[in-house]
């Protein structure tokens, strides 16, 4: 009996050690994109009380240089990968840009803004003189007229909704809530594809985005997903 018990104790120790390693691995995975970004939870995401969109697919950064209006427009209009203005990527999808293979990553942010510096740094990618692409899907239960897209970014950014350019802000700037606001638009019933290109010169880089209702209050009543919901 004693010899059997002696075998069991090391086995239990090994199992406990494995459990601790698994928990540590899970914790590391949750923090894979820095202290404010995590892998998305299951199911659709609703905007918070202030209306900010917190779920995105982000492509690893592409080298780019220039923050003036003309430079940024030239950067974002350049062809980097197939269907860059129409693709709805999946987490883990890869694209080839020049000689580099870049990956799309799904993230949820814990804050109102998406910290691109944390994102890139955590992946060992450059944070200066780079271009980030971001995509999300806004799902509306009904048509929503008279709304506006309100964005902020560090540094410059250009934004598209359902393939149409809505708003851009330029220069070496800090992220300010509602720094750029689009004209009034209508969100379609069903999925609406929101796409952003953020260009950073150096230092910190992040962005935030929300929709404002006809009274310029945070829009509610929609969900955010990273795939078009099945009909």
Give residue ranges: language-model regions.
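Beta-strand-rich ligand-recognition modules
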Residues: 161-210
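Aromatic-lined ligand-binding clefts that engage carbohydrates, nucleic acids, or primary amines
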Residues: 145-160, 194
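Short structured motifs
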Residues: 118-122, 133-135, 178-182
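Accessory carbohydrate-binding/adhesion or oligomerization-edge regions at the termini
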Residues: 30-116, 196-231
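Short beta-strands within extracellular/lumenal beta-sheet-rich domains
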Residues: 128-139
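Non-cytosolic beta-sheet module surface loops
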Residues: 140, 149-153, 198-200
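N-terminal secretory signal peptides that target proteins for export/translocation
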Residues: 1-11
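Bacterial N-terminal signal peptides
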Residues: 11-27
